[in-house]
Amino acid sequence: MASKGVRLLLLLSWVAGPEVLSDILRPSCAPGWFYYRSHCYGYFRKLRNWSHAELECQSYGNGSHLASVLNQKEASVISKYITGYQRNLPVWIGLHDPQKKQLWQWTDGSTNLYRRWNPRTKSEARHCAEMNPKDKFLTWNKNGCANRQHFLCKYKT
């Protein structure tokens, strides 16, 4: 005989539908992180260079890296979240050019080709990507990896 909890979940899934049930049952993110489409995001207002930001993201476990931004909707959700905290400082993301040949890669291994480069961004000797505050964090700049900035981490739930 099914427990009351199992019966309640079955009833909820039948009445509310799978979308509502998935929101109710979605895994929780670490305290201070936010959830969007099977991922948790942590925005950190600490100043770190790009490589130290990536190492700090990895230290949180769960396969966390500097965030990959894979489509316009995800970019919009992130933008709204960050602008709730600040509107002036760039934020590191996980896109970088490790061979310094303009062959950009995501630190989490994502292969999505979505890119939102600011058309005015300079590329010489700049091999790490940041979200641009002048465009509400919806476009990206190439910047020197040694600069110390805020950063955004992401992991899959």
Swiss-Prot record:
* InterPro entries according to UniProt: C-type_lectin-like, C-type_lectin-like/link_sf, C-type_lectin/snaclec_domain, CTDL_fold
The C-type lectin domain sits at 36-154
* Residues of this chain annotated as glycosylated in UniProt: 49, 62
State the UniProt keywords alphabetically.
Disulfide bond, Glycoprotein, Lectin, Secreted, Signal
- Keyword presence, Signal: yes
A GO term from the CC aspect: cytoplasm
Q: Tell me the domain of life.
A: Eukaryota
**GO biological-process terms attached to the record:** response to bacterium
Question: Its function?
Answer: Calcium-independent lectin displaying mannose-binding specificity and able to maintain carbohydrate recognition activity in an acidic environment. May be involved in inflammatory and metaplastic responses of the gastrointestinal epithelium.
- What protein name applies here? Regenerating islet-derived protein 4
> What is the taxonomic lineage of the source species?
Eukaryota, Metazoa, Chordata, Craniata, Vertebrata
